[in-house]
């Protein structure tokens, strides 16, 4: 076992998960839907920064989540703590600027899948600014067509109340629920990597299943665009 895997196991099982269960009403459902071996994509909604602890903490196996590059940047003490936490929890840095840089980042995710491991993705690309479920980015579909594996839809609820936007302290005692749905198979789309309609259809089907599990209202708008709208209204 590599030193990084040892660090992940120690951080998760001896520190993170015990703290989550101590501080919050942390519930996990549907763990039997996670394959005990082999590659799969864990596709989750994204409500709060601490999803990066609650979701991996609920998964028995090691899982590498794709995280935005800003979480790995900065030289301040706070930035270093966040960066260390993200790496300890198995996060992989992803460039969301588009083009070659984004494709290269997704390539790192494909390597994880080819190695027979679990890869975690937030298809919305960023946290929901309003509690609703937003239009998914098609990067997840590209990964699926390049490296066909099952998709496990994941729904988290309550994490947005643990550390609301702008809050400085955690709200202890809040209920947080993580639910894993049944595996989804997209092998019927094999060979259609360049078909943008297929990419959108796969992504929308995944988002629909996440929404069914989470009970969130779905809006066909990217979360990043919705965030700008919310910011403009509050300005």
Q: Model-found features: residue ranges?
A:
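Short gly/ser/thr-rich secondary-structure transition/capping motifs
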Residues: 21-28, 101-103, 160-163
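Helix-to-loop junction immediately C-terminal to a conserved catalytic motif
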Residues: 14-46
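Short secondary-structure boundary/capping segments
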Residues: 18, 32-33, 55-57, 83-84, ...
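A generic local structural motif
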Residues: 14, 26-31, 51-52, 79, ...
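A secondary-structure boundary/capping signal
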Residues: 30, 45, 67-68, 122-124, ...
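Alpha-helical membrane-targeting segments
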Residues: 2-23, 74-90, 169-173
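Non-catalytic C-terminal accessory region of glycerolipid acyltransferases
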Residues: 2-3, 7, 103-235
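Catalytic core of membrane glycerolipid acyltransferases/transacylases, capturing the structured
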Residues: 34-99
